[in-house]
Amino acid sequence: MISLRDIVEKLFNSEDLNYKESYQLFDYFIKGQIELPLQTSILIALKLKQETSTEIAAAVEALLDNTKEFPKINGDLAGIVGTGGDGFNTINISTTAAIVAAAAGYKVAKHGGRSVSSKSGSFDLLESFGVNIELSPQQTKECLELYNLGFLFAPFYSEGFRYIKEARTILKTRTIFNILGPLINPARPNKVVIGVYSKDLILPMAKTLINLGIDRAVVVYGSGLDEVAIHDDTYVAEIQNNQITEYKVSPVDFGIDTYAIKDLEGGLPEHNREIIKQILQGKGKQAHNAAVAVNVAMLMKLYGKDNLKQNTQEILELIKSGKCYQTLQNVISFG
């Protein structure tokens, strides 16, 4: 076993960790074997030197090895998730997109937690709707199979997360745990859209996904947002057959107007709930509908539907029908 002292010494000297060292470090983290002051120092040291794809992949495996097992789902399973930490406090776009994608017929396992650095995390929102976020893995699987949608609350699956919550709250800034969050879904979706908070993270995240054996994915950075943007360009790394293709898309590629980022501003969970309820019931504002639709359209690309304009139009029509709200109601009733 590699000593924590040796690992910390390397980080404080701005040296990259190898796979074994990073795995060991995050095994220490998730088992509560690192004191709070040292936790914060390690997270800052990693951030300052910038995390490598090797460090991230090893950390993912360490955390997944310490999570509750989720029953295998037959067929394709999707994930739509952002790292968080983009600082804009928008409405919960990826969570809404997950619900809409499920209504469109795609099986989606949404993994996440409560807010760390924003006003409303995905599961703060879901709780405000009355979703039971602590269903057993078997119950969540049944919900997924019935309604195409299952919510996996990170602290329920990884009880060790309680050991790192205080450090993340104290720091109130983006850390490697923002990067790890989208990668440690116990349901292990094989088709994922992951938004990152920095353009510099696109390639490391894409390389990590390949290391983890994900067969189809896109990593997106939306000009400041950790999702596909409707205010400006979105930078994309698409993964297929272990190859990474980089490109850029803009609102015109989705056949939508360009909107201001302030049009997506959110607030506390109760405020966001009312906005998202309107979207799902077909009464949402154009900017809100568009933001959700482009993210689902990008997911559809992973299923062989390459026409982003057509995808977006299809989803906008579904949103306007109001049928998406029933999908959420089904999940609430199930719990």
Swiss-Prot record:
Q: Name one GO biological process term.
A: L-tryptophan biosynthetic process
The cysteines covalently paired via disulfide bonds are none
- Which sites bind Mg(2+) 2? 226-227
**Which keywords appear in this protein's UniProt record, sorted alphabetically?**
Amino-acid biosynthesis, Aromatic amino acid biosynthesis, Glycosyltransferase, Magnesium, Metal-binding, Transferase, Tryptophan biosynthesis
**What does it catalyze?**
N-(5-phospho-beta-D-ribosyl)anthranilate + diphosphate = 5-phospho-alpha-D-ribose 1-diphosphate + anthranilate
Q: Does the keyword Protein transport apply?
A: no
What Gene3D superfamilies does its record include? Answer: Nucleoside phosphorylase/phosphoribosyltransferase catalytic domain, Transferase, Pyrimidine Nucleoside Phosphorylase, Chain C
Residues annotated for 5-phospho-alpha-D-ribose 1-diphosphate binding in this entry: 82, 85-86, 90, 92-95, 110-118, 122
Outline the subunit composition.
Homodimer.
Report what the protein is called: Anthranilate phosphoribosyltransferase
Query: Could you read off the lineage of the organism from its UniProt record?
Result: Bacteria, Pseudomonadati, Pseudomonadota, Gammaproteobacteria, Thiotrichales
